[in-house]
Amino acid sequence: MTEARRRQFKVGRVVSNKMQKTVVVAVDYLKPHPLYRKIIRRTSKFHAHDEQQCRIGDIVRIGETRPLSKTKRWEVVEIIKRNEEA
């Protein structure tokens, strides 16, 4: 029998909330260039389940979960900082 994996968490910014109960979260990370070794900033986008609470620009923590749809494998665990402008 396989061991249960620890749940992974990521912190990112909400870039889209146009879908029902789904937000797109952009997570920035730093990675060295393979040849020149300069540190460059990269961005990954994740679709996360949200019960229509997040707004664009919010900083959120997302956690890994079971597959909820074709592209959704994450859920919003908490809203760390609300966007003041929206």
From Swiss-Prot:
Keywords: Ribonucleoprotein, Ribosomal protein, RNA-binding, rRNA-binding. Belongs to the universal ribosomal protein uS17 family. Part of the 30S ribosomal subunit. The keyword RNA-binding applies. One of the primary rRNA binding proteins, it binds specifically to the 5'-end of 16S ribosomal RNA. It comes from Roseiflexus sp. (strain RS-1). It holds the Pfam family Ribosomal_S17. InterPro entries: NA-bd_OB-fold (IPR012340), Ribosomal_uS17 (IPR000266), Ribosomal_uS17_bact/chlr (IPR019984), Ribosomal_uS17_CS (IPR019979). CDD domains: Ribosomal_uS17 (cd00364). It comes from the Bacteria. One of its GO terms (molecular function) is structural constituent of ribosome. The keyword RNA-binding applies. One of its GO terms (cellular component) is cytosolic small ribosomal subunit. This is Small ribosomal subunit protein uS17. GO terms for biological process: translation.
